[in-house]
């Protein structure tokens, strides 16, 4: 447990020393420190890097080559300033410090209390590394950090502010931090050799609680690393502003976050802290000026953590495929193609972050790491096999390979191979049927080319490159040719053909004599116009034209028989109405039948049509009143308009039908029967047979017939 509080998530703190470090220190740290765990394990990376990593792994036991997976997954973030903070310990005894332009924006770490109280700021930084506890608001010590970044006088950090969030922590973690605080106070100043000689995992992580504690703080450098390597790929408009240092081109672009941080400090050791903040945070904020540097470090941490949570669920399940398909791109960027340097680093850092989230649990992280390596190997094998299969299909002469139609190509290759083999083997019915089934399946799939079928059938037509429209057009032309050769049509159009058929039909109709046997004319299929033209006879009377219907027609014969049947039924069906009401109505009818206006007599059946409205007793009074009104009004209308020969309106309608006034007794009798039929139709089953009113009804019927014949 000899490591100091330099594992804080604020990993961008520079040294307190005003003297910049030499380049050899960075070269020594650069060669193995900040490359991801997967990159060191990757068998596809260049040999020079593997040899370099193995050389450092042999010379320095704190970096095992393949040994301890837990320590390696934690230790691959070695850009965090642990060696620099060993040099910082000399300056930690100053409670206040001035502004020095040489140390850049690394002065955020040095403003705290002297060494005996530094366990408390370390706990605060660890709290900021948890994303679920830092989502709302940022602590006031971040504003102090912001003030020191501007170059102002940093206020002294109070112990009350440091203990403000301690209520959220567990008691076992506080107790463990006190133990660490005592161990930290014993080591006054440690050099870089203290870090390099320690290699035992038990001494570094004595308990699971230690690993949980350091595991969450170790997420911070990787998250910022991932955020810095992802943002330039999403914002390409300020990508040209960031020019990569030449040393970075020589190494690799798989882990650009800490690398950029180190080169920024190495190349500009004498610039002011404001300038360094703007240069160093250009990955995250493209237009950060001196006035815009008041973003606190805590807010930066929270933003990075929120971005990490947002993108880890989207891109986490895909990181294995991205690692497989981007190893070649990583090698290209190593050769010097720095056109898009951040895309490979983005994907690899996403993969590393995803793997480190699995390493939170100490017991299950080793198995998950091995499963991840195995899946990556399988994915690379699948990509290699698919590329090899694509190369094999490109060698075949009849197949046009494209990455979209890989399934179709494999089917085509299968058919072609079977076809070539089929020439050397004995043909059997089973093999030919199987071949035909494969060909039909190939046609059933909606592919552009039908050439497997045509090759099997040895067709001379080359329909491989013909689109579907031309194929259909060829079929249509073949059909027309067959029709012209084998099914010749007569030299007549359809209009002429059907017009001649109509003329023949009309000639057959006209040949029938009009006055022949009546049996011939009893046709039900006669048209109405034909019936009217043949059987209508003009009969001139004083008022109207009457159409006399031919009695030989079968339809009118049926109607006449129906009326006779209804007349016979009318003798036995009577309404529920009382005899007194019927006598009153009959007396009023006898008055009406003697009324004459200019030689015109009102039809006697007019009043009887009102009997169909007498269905229930409450309507009887209404019908009698309306009867009187109706009997007088039509004659007034007739008297007023007799010179204009206008028929009375009311007298022309019986049950919705327009019927003219007739003087013929036969016509009036038929109309009377029709009115009686309508009246009985509305009464329906309410009528009943009575012997009491039967004689009276027959007597009244005689009177009606006498009146009709007397006219």
Curated annotation (Swiss-Prot):
Basic and acidic residues bias spans: 48-57, 163-197, 204-213, 220-242, 296-311, 318-349, 371-383
Modified residues (Phosphoserine): 15, 17, 78, 80, 187, 402, 578
Database matches in PANTHER family: BCLAF1 AND THRAP3 FAMILY MEMBER 3, THRAP3/BCLAF1
Primary location group: mitochondrion
Protein name in the entry: BCLAF1 and THRAP3 family member 3
Top-rank lineage group of the source organism: Eukaryota
Recorded GO CC terms: mediator complex; mitochondrion
Ubl conjugation found in the keyword field: yes
Biased composition (Basic residues): 1-15
Record bears the keyword Ubl conjugation: yes
Gene name in the database record: BCLAF3
An annotated GO BP: positive regulation of transcription by RNA polymerase II
């Amino acid at each position: 447990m000899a490591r100091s509080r330099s594992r804080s998530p604020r990993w961008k703190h520079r040294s307190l020393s005003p003297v910049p470090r030499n380049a050899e220190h960075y070269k020594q740290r650069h060669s193995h420190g900040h490359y991801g765990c997967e990159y060191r394990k990757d068998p596809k990376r260049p040999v020079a890097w593997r040899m370099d990593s193995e050389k450092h792994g042999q010379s320095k036991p704190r970096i095992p080559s393949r040994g301890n997976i837990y320590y390696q997954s934690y230790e691959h973030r070695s850009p965090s300033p642990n060696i620099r903070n060993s040099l910082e310990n000399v300056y930690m005894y100053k409670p206040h410090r001035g502004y020095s332009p040489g140390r850049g924006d690394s002065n955020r770490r040095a403003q705290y209390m002297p060494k005996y109280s530094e366990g408390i700021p370390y706990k605060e930084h660890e709290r900021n590394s948890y994303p679920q506890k830092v989502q709302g608001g940022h602590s006031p010590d971040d504003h102090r950090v912001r003030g020191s970044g501007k170059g102002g006088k940093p206020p002294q950090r109070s112990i009350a502010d440091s203990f403000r969030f301690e209520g959220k922590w567990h008691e076992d973690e506080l107790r463990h931090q006190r133990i660490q605080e005592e161990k930290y106070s014993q080591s006054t100043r440690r050099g870089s050799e203290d870090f390099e000689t320690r290699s035992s995992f038990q001494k570094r992580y004595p308990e699971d609680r230690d690993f949980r504690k350091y595991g969450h703080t170790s997420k911070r450098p990787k998250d910022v690393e991932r955020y810095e390597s992802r943002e330039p790929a999403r914002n390409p408009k300020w990508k040209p502003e960031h020019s990569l240092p030449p040393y970075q081109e020589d190494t690799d672009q798989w882990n650009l976050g800490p690398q950029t941080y180190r080169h920024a400090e190495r190349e500009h050791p004498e610039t002011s802290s404001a300038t360094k903040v703007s240069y160093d945070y250009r990955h995250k904020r493209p237009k950060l000026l001196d006035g815009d540097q008041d973003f606190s470090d805590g807010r930066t941490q929270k933003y990075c953590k929120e971005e990490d949570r947002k993108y880890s669920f989207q891109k986490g399940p895909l990181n294995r495929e991205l690692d497989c398909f981007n190893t070649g791109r990583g090698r290209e960027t190593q050769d010097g193609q720095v056109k898009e340097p951040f895309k490979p680093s983005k994907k690899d850092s996403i993969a590393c972050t995803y793997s480190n989230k699995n390493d939170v649990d100490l017991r299950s992280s080793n198995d998950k790491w091995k499963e991840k390596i195995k899946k990556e190997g399988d994915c690379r094998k699948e990509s290699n096999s698919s590329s090899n299969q694509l190369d094999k299909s490109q060698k075949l002469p009849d197949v046009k390979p494209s990455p979209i139609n890989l399934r179709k190509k494999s089917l085509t290759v299968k058919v072609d191979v079977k076809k070539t083999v089929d020439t050397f083997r004995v043909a059997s019915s089973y093999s030919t049927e199987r071949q035909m089934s494969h060909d039909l399946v190939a046609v059933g799939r909606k592919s552009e080319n039908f050439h497997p079928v045509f090759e099997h059938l040895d067709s001379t037509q080359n329909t491989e490159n013909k689109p579907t429209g031309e194929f259909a057009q060829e079929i249509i032309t073949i059909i027309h040719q067959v029709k012209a050769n084998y099914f010749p049509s007569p030299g007549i159009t359809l209009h002429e053909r059907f017009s001649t058929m109509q003329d023949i039909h009309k000639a057959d109709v006209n040949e029938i004599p009009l006055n022949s046997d009546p049996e011939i004319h009893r046709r039900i299929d006669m048209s109405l116009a034909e019936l009217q033209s043949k059987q209508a006879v003009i009969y001139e009377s004083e008022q109207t034209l009457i159409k006399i219907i031919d009695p030989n027609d079968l339809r009118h014969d049926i109607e006449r028989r129906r009326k006779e049947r209804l007349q016979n039924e009318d003798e036995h069906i009577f309404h529920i109405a009382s005899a007194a009401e019927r006598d009153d109505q009959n007396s009023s009818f006898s008055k009406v039948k003697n009324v004459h206006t200019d030689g015109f007599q009102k039809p006697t059946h007019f009043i009887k049509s009102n009997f169909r409205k007498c269905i229930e007793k409450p309507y009887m009074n209404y019908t009698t009143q309306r009867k009187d009104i109706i009997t007088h009004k039509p004659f007034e209308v007739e008297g007023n308009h007799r010179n204009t020969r206008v028929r009375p309106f009311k007298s022309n309608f019986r049950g919705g039908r327009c019927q003219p006034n007739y003087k013929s007794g036969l016509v009036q009798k038929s109309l009377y029967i029709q009115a009686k039929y309508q009246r009985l139709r509305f009464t329906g089953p309410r009528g009943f047979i009575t012997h009491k009113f039967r004689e009276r009804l027959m007597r009244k019927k005689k009177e009606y017939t006498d009146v009709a014949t007397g006219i």
